[in-house]
């Protein structure tokens, strides 16, 4: 191809190693604008050359004189030789090209500003196949590009904390294969436009920005085009700054203490701080008979401060040995960082030994009087209640009738659940029918065989074909035992398989029976899925109610992961015992993927779990994850949320804020719990929010705190966790999206990528219980702090004559 400018001729040669890229002619409108920006020439059009990533580019400028040497420019900037770029007298050669090599190239004589040639180079992962001459040979499916995964592009607004990684995707297809480039706020976006650079993964149609900052906010548009046209899609990015904060001190610590003279005293102070805190213990003193200075600040002495060999954990405890009366007074824990200071105070009261004994004696007398008085009042109250009950008690026949009426209000009807049932029973048939009651009074049903359920031929199993075995565990209203069942597999009626059998305890109530029946019916209607515990059958006739479900030999996921922690680490249960099997990173991703699939199925059946956690996921012999415990599950076919009305035990550390504070349960609140379950998986069964008391957790969640990334978790997976923990429920991903994301991660993960277990898991140790345990500050914090509260703090202290004034 030749183009003439006056008497000068330019020859452009383009060659690629391994494959010859195609050249496509662009219109004068687009190319001419770029030429005018960088070049002083009268070019009528630009020639665009398309190369594949990794190819070699060769551009040549020919002049009438063979002795003329030329300079080369890219986007108006001179090109210097490098290990990839070779410059000859008239030749420019670039090897192993990448997307960053795309741009406008020009050549000029060494002693002239006259442009001899210019070329537009675009580098893609998949170069276009064919020249304009080949258009007639293209298939009938040619046309404008199209989106291949529009469902992955529905979330247009992305709000992330600063320092996170952001990934935008625009999966597309077309014939000829389209190319993609990106705009920010309407202008072309390249790596040099951002301090941290960008990653353009053309095969995945994605733009990746690591460690985002507030200046990255804006609208990002992907433009996908081929010669038939283009399509575009815009994402909006909002980067949230992490607010710096002064330390947070746990409420109630240090606590007031009263001791006898000569005792030893410990004051505790729990500090939470994003930045490294500086902790001091102060004692309030008097100077010239006054506790406060002229400016109103208290006089204090420093009892304990950071030293060369002290740790934050040591500084959180103040020890006083063999206290005297002079030690009585006010003590303050002062914690500060680069942002500010926070403090909590407590009083120490020191009593003489005899006074404390007198107090104990007088206290014993008062306690005795109080206990006797309380006992007398309770006795009289019980006596009155018994008399009233006997006065109102009818004859035996009337009593039986009344009891039957009371319990007959209990039977459930299938019409109460709006899910479509596959059961063969009539929709109005009561699930429980009363036949007779024992003579025992009260609502306790010690002999549950006195309640009959109509048989369901599809699920009924004769008791003679069931052999009960060892207990497996106990639930809220019943127990689970292992059993051998014959006839579960209809194709092999004589084959025995191992099952788990749910049954009521001996002291079960009618409400307990209602819950078990409801769970059985729910499992019937939800149907079967590989990643949930499925119903296998039931024994409802001639005896207690038995519900047969799948048996998972490896127990729950939490214990499964903990049993496979490596030996020799301080977080391993038994350092002498080798783990049962070594887990790879892909094994952990597979666990998460399977649970997500099970939850996707439950969500499709309009079922909200409300108690999703690793302890409620069971593992089979073949390492298949199965979601269990539908006891808290509820049908929400007609409504999209469920408000809990009872005050039963709730798994607060797995609960979404809207469920925790407003008792509103949706599929999005299950997604939050799934994020916590992901954290459990990648800490090999760690306890969420280790060392954080429940009361403190409420406050921290309201302030936007989230758990930090586990040591063996990739940044992409941690981003999935953080998306699950979005404060706005509607901004969390759906389980369908989670399945797709985890499937992608699973596909890209190596099968032999073993965990880097050289990093200790101190903050995920089993010692970190879910109750009121301690937590160190600084690097041991499990929180990523977003927004934090204002707290009163002491002014910065200054030395004053050997006494610290604050």
Swiss-Prot record:
> Which residues are noted as glycosylation sites?
83, 96, 118, 219, 256, 288, 309, 322
One Gene Ontology BP term is: positive regulation of macromolecule metabolic process
Q: What is the superkingdom listed in this entry's lineage?
A: Eukaryota
Q: Where is the protein situated, by its record's location annotation?
A: Cell membrane
Q: Which is a Pfam family this sequence falls into?
A: PK_Tyr_Ser-Thr
- Cytoplasmic topological domain: 390-806
Q: List the disulfide bonds.
A: 61-107, 170-222, 269-333
Residue ranges of domain Ig-like C2-type in the record: 24-124, 150-238, 247-349
Regulation (activators, inhibitors) = Present in an inactive conformation in the absence of bound ligand. Ligand binding leads to dimerization and activation by autophosphorylation on tyrosine residues.
> Any idea which GO molecular function terms this record carries?
ATP binding; fibroblast growth factor binding; fibroblast growth factor receptor activity
Function of the molecule:
Tyrosine-protein kinase that acts as a cell-surface receptor for fibroblast growth factors and plays an essential role in the regulation of cell proliferation, differentiation and apoptosis. Plays an essential role in the regulation of chondrocyte differentiation, proliferation and apoptosis, and is required for normal skeleton development. Regulates both osteogenesis and postnatal bone mineralization by osteoblasts. Promotes apoptosis in chondrocytes, but can also promote cancer cell proliferation. Phosphorylates PLCG1, CBL and FRS2.
* Assembly and oligomerization: Monomer. Homodimer after ligand binding.
Identify its protein family: Belongs to the protein kinase superfamily. Tyr protein kinase family. Fibroblast growth factor receptor subfamily.
**Mind telling me what this protein is named?**
Fibroblast growth factor receptor 3
**What organism does the UniProt record list as the source?**
Gallus gallus
Task: Identify the coding gene.
Answer: FGFR3
């Amino acid at each position: 191809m030749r183009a003439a400018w006056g008497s000068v001729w330019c020859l452009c040669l383009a060659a690629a190693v391994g494959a010859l890229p195609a050249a496509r002619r662009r219109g004068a409108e687009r190319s001419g604008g770029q030429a005018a920006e960088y070049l002083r020439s009268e070019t009528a059009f630009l020639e665009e050359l398309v190369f594949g990533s990794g190819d070699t580019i060769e551009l040549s400028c020919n002049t009438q004189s063979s002795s003329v040497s030329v300079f080369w420019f890219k986007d108006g900037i001179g090109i210097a030789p490098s290990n990839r770029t070779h410059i000859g007298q008239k030749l420019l050669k670039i090897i192993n090209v990448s997307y960053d090599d795309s741009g406008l190239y020009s050549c000029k004589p060494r002693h002239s500003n006259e442009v001899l040639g210019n070329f537009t180079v675009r580098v893609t992962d998949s170069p276009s196949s064919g020249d304009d001459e080949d258009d007639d040979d293209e298939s009938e499916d040619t046309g404008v590009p199209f989106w291949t995964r529009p469902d992955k592009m529905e979330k247009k607004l992305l709000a992330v904390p600063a320092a996170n990684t952001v990934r935008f995707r625009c999966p597309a297809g077309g014939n000829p294969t389209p190319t993609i480039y990106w705009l920010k706020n309407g202008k072309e976006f390249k790596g040099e436009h951002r301090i941290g650079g960008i990653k353009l993964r053309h095969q995945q149609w994605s733009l990746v920005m690591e460690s985002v900052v507030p200046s990255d906010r804006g609208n990002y548009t992907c433009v996908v085009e081929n010669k038939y046209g283009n399509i575009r899609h815009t994402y909006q990015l909002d980067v949230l700054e992490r607010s710096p904060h002064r330390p947070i001190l746990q409420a109630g610590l240090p606590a007031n203490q009263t001791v006898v003279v000569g005792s030893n005293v410990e004051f505790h102070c729990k500090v939470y701080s994003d930045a490294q805190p500086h902790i001091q213990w102060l004692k309030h003193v008097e100077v010239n008979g006054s506790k406060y200075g002229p400016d109103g600040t208290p006089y204090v002495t420093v009892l304990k401060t950071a030293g060369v060999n002290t740790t934050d954990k040591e500084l959180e405890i103040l020890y006083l040995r063999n206290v005297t009366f002079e030690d009585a007074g006010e003590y303050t824990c002062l914690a500060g960082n680069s942002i500010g200071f926070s403090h909590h105070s407590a009083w120490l009261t020191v009593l003489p030994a005899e006074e404390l004994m007198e107090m104990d004696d007088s206290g014993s007398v008062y306690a005795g009087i109080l206990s006797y008085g309380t006992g007398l009042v309770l006795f009289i109250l019980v006596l009155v209640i018994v008399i009233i009950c006997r006065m109102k008690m009818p004859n035996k026949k009337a009593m039986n009738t009344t009891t039957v009426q009371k319990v007959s209000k209990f039977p459930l009807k299938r019409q109460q659940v709006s899910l479509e049932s596959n059961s063969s029973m009539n929709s109005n048939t009561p699930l429980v029918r009363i036949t007779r009651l024992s003579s025992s009074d009260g609502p306790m049903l010690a002999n549950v065989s006195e309640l009959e359920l109509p048989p369901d031929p599809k699920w009924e199993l004769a008791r003679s074909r069931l052999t009960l075995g060892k207990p497996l565990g106990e639930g809220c209203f019943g127990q689970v035992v292992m059993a051998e069942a014959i006839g579960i597999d209809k194709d092999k009626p004589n084959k025995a398989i191992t099952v788990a059998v749910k049954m009521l305890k001996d002291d079960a109530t009618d409400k307990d029976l209602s819950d078990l029946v409801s769970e059985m019916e729910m499992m019937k209607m939800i149907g079967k899925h590989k990643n949930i515990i499925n119903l296998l059958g039931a024994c409802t006739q001639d005896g207690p109610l038995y519900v047969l479900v799948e048996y998972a030999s490896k127990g729950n996921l939490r214990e499964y992961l903990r049993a496979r922690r490596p030996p020799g680490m301080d977080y391993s249960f038994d350092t002498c015992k080798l783990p049962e099997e070594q887990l790879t990173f892909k094994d952990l991703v597979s666990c998460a993927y399977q649970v997500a699939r099970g939850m996707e199925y439950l969500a499709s059946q309009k079922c909200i779990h409300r108690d999703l956690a690793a302890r409620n996921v069971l593992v089979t012999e073949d390492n298949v994850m199965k979601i269990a415990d539908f006891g808290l599950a509820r049908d929400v076919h007609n409504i999209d949320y469920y408000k809990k009305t009872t005050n039963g035990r709730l798994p607060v550390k797995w609960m979404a804020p809207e469920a925790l504070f407003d008792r509103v349960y949706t599929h999005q609140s299950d997604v939050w719990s799934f994020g916590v379950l992901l954290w459990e998986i990648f800490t090999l069964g760690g306890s969420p929010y280790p060392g954080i008391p429940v009361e403190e957790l409420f406050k921290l969640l309201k302030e936007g705190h989230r758990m930090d990334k586990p040591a063996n978790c990739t940044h992409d997976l941690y981003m999935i966790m953080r998306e699950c923990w979005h404060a706005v429920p509607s901004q969390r991903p759906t389980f369908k999206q989670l399945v797709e994301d985890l499937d992608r991660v699973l596909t890209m993960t190596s099968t032999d990528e073993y965990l880097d277990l050289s990093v200790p898991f101190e903050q995920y140790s089993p010692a970190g219980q879910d109750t009121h345990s301690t937590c160190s500050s600084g690097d041991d914090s499990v929180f990523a702090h977003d927004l934090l509260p204002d707290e009163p703090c002491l002014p910065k202290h200054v030395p004053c004559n050997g006494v610290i004034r604050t």
